[in-house]
Swiss-Prot record:
Family: Belongs to the GINS4/SLD5 family.
A GO CC annotation given for this chain: nuclear replication fork
Subunit and interaction comment: Component of the GINS complex which is a heterotetramer of SLD5, PSF1, PSF2 and PSF3.
Originating species: Debaryomyces hansenii (strain ATCC 36239 / CBS 767 / BCRC 21394 / JCM 1990 / NBRC 0083 / IGC 2968)
Taxonomy, superkingdom: Eukaryota
Protein name per UniProt: DNA replication complex GINS protein SLD5
Function in brief: The GINS complex plays an essential role in the initiation of DNA replication. Has a role in chromosome segregation.
Keywords tagged on the record: Chromosome partition, DNA replication, Nucleus
PANTHER family, per database record: DNA REPLICATION COMPLEX GINS PROTEIN SLD5 (PTHR21206:SF0), SLD5 PROTEIN (PTHR21206)
Subcellular location(s) of the protein: Nucleus
Record-level GO BP terms: chromosome segregation; DNA-templated DNA replication; double-strand break repair via break-induced replication
């Protein structure tokens, strides 16, 4: 094997090899497409000032892939242990298991990074997202948050409210204890700054026209890199025409 190959080359070579067919009954397939989609989702989430719609279908596919790979590894290790003295377990077989373990680790890392980024925003703007998702069905594939994120958000808010009440709110007049007070021209609710500038790359072939102000439009073309207000291109990120970089 060429020592200059990186892990992606090795994984691709592995996916194209005959040995891969042994794992077909576990539903293990080429994970490069899943990996690329997960990288894009993770980068978009990390670079955006607010929470993007949860990738329901992608995450379901990723978690299924991880479960299948882990089951395959478990069964393969049991097979290897029971045949260790027979000579059946070859170097190629061991390499196959090492490659799958590497694939599991990199997918796990991206999933954790994606979810931690989302939870950090939920922690920071809890009341805002409670209001934003008040009419959402978390089981719907188009909902902003996953069911687990929604549950986490409400538990986090409950704990936070109890902490504030026990620490200092119970000693204050009632009209000063509202965490979501918007009266007096000053909102107590922290919200993401959707007008901050972000770096973007256009990946759709169809040019996108965005309105900068009353007299000026900006044409975004394929493979072009721009710095624009997040609010102007958020919808294009959600439909996949633009990615954040």
């Amino acid at each position: 094997m060429n020592k200059d190959l990186d892990i992606d080359d090795i994984l691709q070579e592995f996916d194209d090899s005959n040995v891969h067919s042994k794992s077909s009954k576990y539903g293990i397939r080429n994970s490069e497409n899943i990996y690329d989609q997960l990288v894009a989702a993770m980068l978009n989430e990390r670079m955006s000032p607010d929470v993007l719609p949860y990738k329901h279908e992608l995450m379901k596919e990723v978690l299924t892939q991880l479960s299948n790979q882990q089951q395959y590894l478990l069964d393969s290790h049991e097979y290897g242990d029971s045949n260790v003295e027979s000579g059946i377990v070859t170097g190629d077989f061991k390499l196959q298991l090492m490659i799958i373990e590497t694939d599991i680790e990199r997918l796990n890392y991206l999933v954790r990074l994606y979810l931690r980024t989302r939870l950090a925003k939920i922690d920071k703007f809890t009341i805002h997202y409670i209001n934003e998702t008040s009419n959402d069905d978390p089981t719907n594939d188009r909902s902003l948050l996953s069911p687990e994120e929604t549950e986490y958000m409400h538990k986090h808010f409950k704990i936070l409210t109890q902490l504030y009440n026990n620490s200092f709110l119970k000693k204050m007049p009632h009209f000063l204890t509202l965490l979501d007070d918007t009266s007096g021209g000053q909102s107590m609710i922290s919200v993401p700054d959707i007008n901050q500038p972000v770096f973007i790359k256009v990946i759709t072939k169809v040019p996108i026209i965005i309105n900068l102000d009353e007299d000026e439009d900006l044409e975004l073309v394929e493979n072009g890199i721009y710095v624009v207000k997040y609010s102007l291109i958020k919808k294009y990120i959600e439909i996949g025409d633009i990615v954040l970089i």
